[in-house]
């Protein structure tokens, strides 16, 4: 990044912070703080091992220093400003989840547009929240748009604060369905002297597979026999014979199938359940970044600060507002709206931000400031002289 661009961005970040306050987390005085300044050259330097006391007045610190990126620790410490991790005195840590579009299946960073990435990531976020709220019954959650290509979720329930890395890895494995065994989704029940094996329908992965089984059975009933048979044979391990057995079980004992009885149709239904379980775990998982969640000392972006790689706001989102949240509109800083600037670029592309489509071509362009800041922060443009 050249000097003119760097100084311009630092100055405008400072203007933003003079009118906006970062959103401090609970127990802010127990957290470690870090930031990346606007240093010359291509590299970056993280300044960390700071306490809230070291920063002084937070609003003044941000207005004066205008950091490129700002972070706080998921952990709480006895002495957060100590210069080594061993001296800090770890107390507890939030359970943090990171979703990044780069890690989503089907997303190619070189081919998928930024709006498409964010849309895919939001769907993954909704799946993650289903796990956290429905399966784990967490209720102290904070959802944050990262300002880049994804979302963070901070869980602060008392029950998670003292979990070690291995326990947190178990949560990751559950959400990502790692080593999930179909047999673990089935329980044995006794009724009037007989036993049967049924899917666990009270929640979790068993309930998801059970729901998929009911939907699949309903779809088959709406087809003629030949189409239903062909649909079943698309699944691994189901040939014509097993397909006939499954359809017969659906016809003879639909109630048992709807109850999740995996023995209602013998090996055919059991094979169907296994195939549906594989399909459900492939589509319903949330591809969270495992190292972020398992790290009990992780630094994570501070809400209401600016992301130095996009110029967008790291935005906390009320749970009730999540469906309507549009990061391309709602994370654009008001400070960068309403004026135009001149930039130089070598790219030919369209930027979709703040409800506008801004086209830039190689050479000098006059663009809305929010679009110019976005391109400069990403390294795709340089600040041009205004005259």
From Swiss-Prot:
GO terms for cellular component: DNA-directed RNA polymerase complex; primosome complex. Its EC number is 2.7.7.-. SUPFAM superfamilies: Prim-pol domain (SSF56747). Keywords: DNA replication, DNA-directed RNA polymerase, Magnesium, Manganese, Metal-binding, Nucleotidyltransferase, Primosome, Transcription, Transferase. The keyword rRNA-binding does not apply. It is an enzyme of class 2 (transferase). The active site is at residues 98, 100, 289. GO terms for molecular function: DNA-directed RNA polymerase activity; metal ion binding. InterPro entries: DNA_primase_S, DNA_primase_ssu_euk/arc, DNA_primase_ssu_PriS. GO terms for biological process: DNA replication, synthesis of primer. Its cofactor is Mg(2+); Mn(2+). Pfam families: DNA_primase_S. Heterodimer of a small subunit (PriS) and a large subunit (PriL). PANTHER family: DNA PRIMASE SMALL SUBUNIT. Catalytic subunit of DNA primase, an RNA polymerase that catalyzes the synthesis of short RNA molecules used as primers for DNA polymerase during DNA replication. The small subunit contains the primase catalytic core and has DNA synthesis activity on its own. Binding to the large subunit stabilizes and modulates the activity, increasing the rate of DNA synthesis while decreasing the length of the DNA fragments, and conferring RNA synthesis capability. The DNA polymerase activity may enable DNA primase to also catalyze primer extension after primer synthesis. May also play a role in DNA repair. This is DNA primase small subunit PriS.
């Amino acid at each position: 990044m050249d000097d003119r661009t760097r100084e311009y961005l630092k100055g405008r970040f400072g203007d933003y912070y003079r009118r906006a306050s970062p959103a401090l987390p609970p127990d802010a005085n127990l957290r470690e703080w870090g930031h990346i300044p606007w240093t010359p050259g291509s590299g970056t330097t993280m300044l960390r091992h700071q306490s809230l006391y070291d920063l002084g007045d937070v609003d003044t610190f941000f207005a004066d220093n205008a950091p490129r990126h700002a972070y706080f620790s998921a952990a709480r410490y006895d002495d957060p400003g100590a210069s080594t991790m061993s001296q800090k005195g770890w107390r507890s840590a939030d359970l943090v989840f990171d979703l990044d579009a780069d890690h989503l299946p089907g997303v190619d960073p070189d081919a998928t547009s930024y709006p498409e990435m964010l849309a895919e990531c939001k769907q993954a976020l909704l799946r993650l929240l289903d796990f956290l709220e429905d399966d784990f019954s967490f209720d102290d959650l904070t959802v944050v748009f990262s300002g880049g290509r994804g979302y963070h979720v901070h869980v602060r329930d008392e029950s998670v604060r003292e979990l070690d890395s291995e326990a947190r890895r178990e949560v990751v494995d559950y959400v990502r369905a790692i080593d999930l065994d179909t047999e673990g989704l089935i329980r044995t029940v006794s009724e009037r002297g007989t036993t049967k094996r049924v899917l666990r329908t009270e929640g979790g992965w068993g309930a998801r597979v059970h729901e998929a089984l009911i939907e699949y059975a309903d779809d088959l009933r709406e087809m003629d026999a030949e189409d239903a048979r062909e649909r079943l044979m698309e699944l691994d391990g189901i040939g014509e014979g097993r397909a006939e057995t499954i359809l017969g079980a659906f016809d003879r004992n639909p109630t048992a199938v709807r109850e999740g009885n995996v023995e209602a149709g013998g090996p055919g239904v059991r094979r169907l359940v296994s195939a549906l379980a594989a399909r459900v775990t492939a589509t319903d998982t949330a591809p969270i970044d495992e190292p972020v969640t398992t790290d009990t000392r992780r630094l994570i972006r501070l809400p209401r600060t600016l992301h130095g790689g996009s110029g967008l706001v790291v935005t906390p989102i009320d749970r009730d507002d999540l469906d309507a949240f549009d990061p391309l509109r709602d994370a654009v800083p008001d400070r960068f709206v309403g004026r135009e600037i001149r930039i130089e670029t070598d790219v030919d592309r369209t930027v979709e931000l703040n409800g506008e489509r801004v086209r830039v071509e190689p050479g000098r362009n006059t663009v809305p400031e929010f679009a110019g800041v976005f391109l400069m922060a990403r390294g795709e443009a340089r600040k041009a002289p205004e005259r």
